[in-house]
Design a protein with these regions (language model features):
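Extended hydrophobic leader/signal-anchor segments used for secretion and membrane insertion
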Residues: 1-113
Length: 113
């Protein structure tokens, strides 16, 4: 039963970089919840990106407008703008060709750092 839970409900991973410091230290273990329900600004999520699996914080949700470093973003339906807490050392929405991550690419919502 525990194995089934970790295949379908929970996700254990690690933080691959310094991009979420000081909240999450590089290489620290994290626990995510797969049937994450509603996502809100401020939630930390684990998601797939064309360059790998990342851990970032939701900066803006579908339908929201946000200004980041002088640039205004309008978040489309079913998408999110994601940023690392360590803005000086984070490869995130600010640098991607398409700055938005669609909800289907979100794997889990962080439960425990």
């Amino acid at each position: 039963i525990i194995l089934i839970l970790f295949q379908t409900v929970f996700l254990i991973g690690y933080v691959p970089s310094e991009s979420m410091e000081p909240t999450l230290k590089e290489n620290s273990l994290i626990l995510g919840f797969r049937p994450y329900g509603e996502l809100n600004t401020g939630d930390i999520v684990i998601f797939e990106h064309e360059e790998g699996v990342f851990v970032k914080r939701i900066a803006a949700c579908p339908g929201e407008e946000i200004e980041v470093e002088g640039k205004t973003y309008y978040v489309p339906p079913d998408s999110y703008l994601l940023l690392g807490d360590n803005k000086e050392n984070s490869y995130d929405s600010r640098y991607w060709e398409d700055p938005f991550i669609c909800e289907e690419k979100i794997i889990a919502k962080l439960l425990l750092p």
